[in-house]
From Swiss-Prot:
Orotate binds at residue 127. Pfam families: Pribosyltran. SUPFAM superfamilies: PRTase-like. The lineage of its organism: Bacteria, Bacillati, Bacillota, Bacilli, Lactobacillales. Catalyzes the transfer of a ribosyl phosphate group from 5-phosphoribose 1-diphosphate to orotate, leading to the formation of orotidine monophosphate (OMP). This is Orotate phosphoribosyltransferase. The keyword Transcription does not apply. The gene is pyrE. It comes from Enterococcus faecalis (strain ATCC 700802 / V583). Its EC number is 2.4.2.10. Pathway: Pyrimidine metabolism; UMP biosynthesis via de novo pathway; UMP from orotate: step 1/2. It catalyses: orotidine 5'-phosphate + diphosphate = orotate + 5-phospho-alpha-D-ribose 1-diphosphate. One of its GO terms (molecular function) is orotate phosphoribosyltransferase activity. One of its GO terms (biological process) is 'de novo' UMP biosynthetic process.
Length: 210
């Protein structure tokens, strides 16, 4: 666990982009009961936090994919972070819709990419990875070479890990669920007795709490 990972996890807790509540779980749209709720869009409203995130993502991308030529953001949550990262790296930026428009030119990708252009796709949050992997596939259909995905946070769900492995897609994240639990405990957002319950959710979210 790096200092940056723990600092960003703490920041997400402090600005209430992330809530942990193992005793009164949230219900996701999928029906899964979860002790965590994450809305990283809130980071846009905190200049110091969003700057730290953008600089962290830019540094990871530059280190892992020095050959990157274009930054893509997923619509809508990945767009602002992609714009800030592209600005730091001095690179072109595009964004990828979840599906093609049903009017005009029917674009799924907004902005310009060229055949073989090396791309990193930015997402704010990774659960199963389904939507961002579909975005990466859409970019490749348009001619891009997707080097990998970069995100602020991952729940570290087994299904997500398996999906990225299945697509042979590299995933970079600034922080993760395990680090968040450690940071929350240190900052007294949770108690020691909550830790096991929180850790159990990550292993089997579909059956947790049943």
């Amino acid at each position: 666990m790096t200092k940056v990972a723990k600092k960003i996890a703490k920041d997400l807790l402090d600005i209430e982009a992330v809530f942990l509540n193992p005793n009164e779980p949230f219900t996701w749209a999928s029906g899964i009961k979860s002790p965590i709720y994450c809305d990283n869009r809130i980071t846009m409203s905190y200049p110091a936090v969003r700057k730290e995130i953008a600089e962290g993502l830019a540094a990871k991308i530059k280190e892992t994919f020095p050959e990157v030529e274009v930054i893509a953001g997923t619509a809508t949550a990945g767009i602002p972070h992609a714009a800030w990262v592209a600005d730091i790296l001095g690179l072109p930026m595009v964004y990828i819709r979840s599906k093609a428009k049903d009017h005009g030119k029917g674009n799924q990708i907004e902005g310009r990419i060229s055949e073989g252009q090396k791309m990193v796709v930015i997402e704010d949050l990774i659960s199963t990875g389904g939507s961002v992997l579909e975005a990466a596939e859409a970019a490749e259909r348009e001619g891009a070479t997707v080097l990998g995905v970069a995100a602020i946070f991952t729940y570290e769900l087994p299904k997500g890990t398996a999906n990225f492995a299945d697509k042979q897609m590299t995933l970079l994240t600034l922080t993760n669920y395990s680090t968040l639990i450690d940071a929350a405990l240190e900052a007294n957002y949770i108690e020691e007795k909550d830790v096991t319950l929180l850790q159990e959710w990550k292993k089997d979210p579909e059956n947790w709490g049943k």
